[in-house]
C-alpha cells in the first residue's frame, strides 16, 4: 500500500495552529516527507538557524566547491536528530540510491552526494534547502493532533518550501487556504 492509497499526507504542508503549546513548533510550517500507518516524518521549512549558512556547513564538512558557496541559511528541520542533515530539493536532481520523492516536484536526499551537488560537483537541483533534524510522529500521533486542531494542512508550492522569506511563510501558508492569522483562535478544540 502506498501513501497515496489512504488518508496519508505525504507531500503536504502542516501549518501549526496558534497556541500549539510547543515552542519548537510555534508558527511552524512543516513539509511532510513521509506519512503512513506507522509513522510520519517532516521538515520545518521556516525555521532558519541564524548565522549558519549552507556554504559554512559545506566548508565545515570539507566539501570542496567548484562554485561560490550558497549563503542560504540552514533550517532547523525539527527536534529529532538535530545533528543529522537533510536536503529538500526540486526533483530535477536525483541520487538514485538515496533520493525519495515527496511529491509535488520535491525530493528528499540525505547523503554526501547531494552535498557535493550543492557545492557544484554534479548537476545541481534548481532549488534546495538544507535542514538539521526532523519532526517525527509515532503511529496515529499526527492523525490525533490533526483531529485536535493542532495542525492545518495545505498543498505545497516552491515559494513556500524553498523561498527565503521565512518569517512570512506561516501567514502565507494560511492565506493559501483562505485563512488569516487574525481569524484563528489560540485555543483549539471541538464543539
Describe the role of every protein-language-model region:
Residues 1-131, 135-191:
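A short aromatic-anchored loop/beta-hairpin motif
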Amino acid at each position: 500500500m502506498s501513501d497515496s492509497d489512504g488518508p496519508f499526507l505525504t507531500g503536504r504542508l502542516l501549518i501549526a495552529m496558534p497556541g500549539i503549546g510547543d515552542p519548537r513548533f510555534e508558527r511552524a510550517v512543516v513539509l511532510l516527507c513521509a506519512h503512513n500507518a506507522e509513522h510520519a516524518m517532516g521538515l520545518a521549512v521556516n525555521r532558519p538557524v541564524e548565522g549558519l549558512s549552507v556554504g559554512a556547513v559545506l566548508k565545515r564538512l570539507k566539501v570542496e566547491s567548484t562554485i561560490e558557496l550558497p549563503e542560504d541559511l540552514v533550517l532547523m528541520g525539527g527536534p529529532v536528530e538535530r545533528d543529522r542533515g537533510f536536503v529538500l530539493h526540486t526533483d530535477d536532481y536525483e541520487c538514485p540510491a538515496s533520493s525519495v520523492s515527496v511529491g509535488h516536484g520535491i525530493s528528499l536526499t540525505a547523503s554526501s552526494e547531494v552535498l557535493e551537488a550543492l557545492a557544484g560537483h554534479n548537476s545541481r537541483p534548481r532549488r534546495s534547502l538544507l535542514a538539521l533534524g526532523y519532526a517525527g510522529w509515532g503511529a496515529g500521533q499526527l492523525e490525533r493532533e490533526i483531529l485536535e486542531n493542532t495542525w492545518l494542512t495545505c498543498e505545497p508550492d516552491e515559494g513556500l518550501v524553498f523561498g527565503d522569506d521565512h518569517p512570512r511563510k506561516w501567514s502565507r501558508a494560511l492565506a493559501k487556504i483562505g485563512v488569516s492569522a487574525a481569524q484563528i483562535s489560540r485555543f483549539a478544540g471541538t464543539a
